[in-house]
Amino acid sequence: MPFWKAGKNDDQVLDELKEMQKQNADEFVKKQEHADEAQKSSLIIDNNFTPVEYDPQYILQVNHLKKYFPIKGGMVSKTVGYVKAVDGVTFNLKRGTTMGLVGESGCGKTTTGRTILRLYDSKSGGQVLFNGQEVYDLSHKELRALRTKMQIIFQDPFSSLSPRMPVGEIIGEAVREHNLVPKAEFDDYIDQVMDNCGLQPFHKDRYPHEFSGGQRQRICIARALALNPEFIVCDEP
C-alpha cells in the first residue's frame, strides 16, 4: 500500500498509515506466537531420547546431539525461529580408531565437532559422553583439565593462529599452561613436536604470516599434537 495517492487528503493518508501499522503489529504477534510454539515443540523433541550408559570400549559416545541457533526478528529482536545446524546426530567412536563425517558444505559437520568439544556454551539436546563423562555437566575446572585430552585442528589455519605470537609460543602455550613438560625439557619437547610435523626448530621464532598455507596447517596440527590428546577433531585440515 503506497504512502500517498493523488486526490487523497491528509486524513485519508493518516488512516491508511494507521491501518498499515496495525497490520504490521498483527503480523509480528503471529510470528512471535509461532516462535513460542516452535520453542515449546523443540523442548519436547529435545527431551525425547533414551540416555545411553557408558561403554568402556568407546572413548566418545554421541547420542541424539542437537545444536540450534536462534533466528532473531521483529522490533525487539525476539526469537522467531531456529536454524537446526545439528539435529539428532548419534555415533560411537572406539579408542584408537578414525571416523569420517561426510556431508555437503553447510550441513553441520563443523558445528558437530565444536559442539562435541563444548566450544559453545550449551547444546540444544542429547548427550556427549567422553570417557563416560557428560561434557556439558563438567565444571569450569574439570573442563579445563579435559581440554588436554580433546583437541581440534581448525579448518582455517590463518584465522586460528595469533598473528602476534611466534610459532614456538603458539605450539607450546598450552603445554606450558598445563605444566605437561618440565621446564628444562620444554624447548627440546617443542622441537620434537615440530620435527614430527615437518617443521624445523628455527621456525619457532617466525610468525604465522611468514608461512605458506600448508605450513600454517602443520603448525595447527603441531599445536594439537603437543598436548598428546586422546581425541582430535580434524576439521578438513
Go through the PLM ranges and name each one:
Residues 232-235:
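Catalytic Walker B motif of ABC-type/P-loop ATPase nucleotide-binding domains
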Residues 76-79, 135-151, 177:
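ABC ATPase NBD coupling module
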Residues 125-134:
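Conserved ABC transporter NBD signature motif
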Residues 228:
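Conserved catalytic motifs of ABC-family nucleotide-binding domains
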Residues 134, 185-202:
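Conserved ABC ATPase "signature" region
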Residues 221:
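Hydrophobic anchor residue at the start of the ABC signature
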Residues 207-211, 215:
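Conserved ABC ATPase signature
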